[in-house]
Amino acid sequence: MKPFPRAEISSSALQNNLAVLRQQASASQVMAVVKANGYGHGLLNVANCLVNADGFGLARLEEALELRAGGVKARLLLLEGFFRSTDLPLLVAHDIDTVVHHESQIEMLEQVKLTKPVTVWLKVDSGMHRLGVTPEQFATVYARLMACPNIAKPIHLMTHFACADEPDNHYTDVQMAAFNELTAGLPGFRTLANSAGALYWPKSQGDWIRPGIALYGVSPVAGDCGTNHGLIPAMNLVSRLIAVRDHKANQPVGYGCYWTAKQDTRLGVVAIGYGDGYPRNAPEGTPVWVNGRRVPIVGRVSMDMLTVDLGQDATDKVGDDVLLWGQDLPVEEVAERIGTIAYELVTKLTPRVAVCLA
């Protein structure tokens, strides 16, 4: 018997999306970003489906170690870098690359004793102003890294875009120009493009692209949908009806009596709530998919349940599946209705939701 709620992960969708991104950036290698438990899709699930990726990007050392323990041999890169000097021997032992973005990391690399050098990607702050060495610091930092015997040569170079998900915002051009001017003539790989860069800014593609959300079939751009680019949603979030009730006009439903029926109808109660990661602030009218049609959420989302208006003539039954988002109901649409982004929806599912390959 299938569990519910469950996140059904499509291996064929993941593979399709990788192929689409390869075609989009045919001269680049692909570093598939699988941080945050593979964007909620299951870290090892995703990595095992994407065996043809050239490498994987992660946020935490623990994620990289999990991939190595799971048999993944591809290049791994810690996108936030290491946090402690005691991390460095683990990078060496497990052949894990690291981003360097801060003075404190350089000091640790200069002071630690290692059995072999670490592969480093120096992050340049080209305009996002979150992580990275500034243009003013770059020459000095680069020289220190080149002089450090604990760092493998060549040093690779990277940056991150602030506004690439706004295709008409030319700040991305400004960032590309700053990065390219600063790093001109230096050896090593270059990586600039995230999902939005790969899809919308072909000049940013470089030696490696670092797609995240697009791998999961989701567009990084507000108002857009991954299917417009040939991407396929990789997650179907599914639960089921646990009650179907006749409901009279002018009667409320749920906590706070937030919603009142305008006419006689049939309500369905769905076994999913904010305890599973479905947002409590989903407003009235947020769609779910039941038996081939959209129906609206009514009343407040509670911890374990939400209620939908099935309609006066509904024939839906207890036990029928309910799709919260996925191939028939894009997560981008649900996120826009709720007032958030698809990234947040897919990554905030709680452990009560079974994640399984479909």
UniProtKB/Swiss-Prot annotation:
The protein here is known as Alanine racemase
Catalytic residue positions: 35, 255
Enumerate the cofactors the protein uses: pyridoxal 5'-phosphate
N6-(pyridoxal phosphate)lysine: which positions carry it?
35
Q: What does this protein do?
A: Catalyzes the interconversion of L-alanine and D-alanine. May also act on other amino acids.
**GO MF term set:** alanine racemase activity; pyridoxal phosphate binding
Which catalysed reactions does the entry list for this protein? L-alanine = D-alanine
Q: Give the gene that encodes this protein.
A: alr
Which superkingdom is the protein from? Bacteria
Q: Which residues bind substrate?
A: 130, 303
Q: What is the lineage of its organism?
A: Bacteria, Pseudomonadati, Pseudomonadota, Gammaproteobacteria, Alteromonadales
Look up keyword Isomerase and say if it applies.
yes
> Which pathway or pathways does this protein act in?
Amino-acid biosynthesis; D-alanine biosynthesis; D-alanine from L-alanine: step 1/1
Source organism of this protein record = Shewanella putrefaciens (strain CN-32 / ATCC BAA-453)
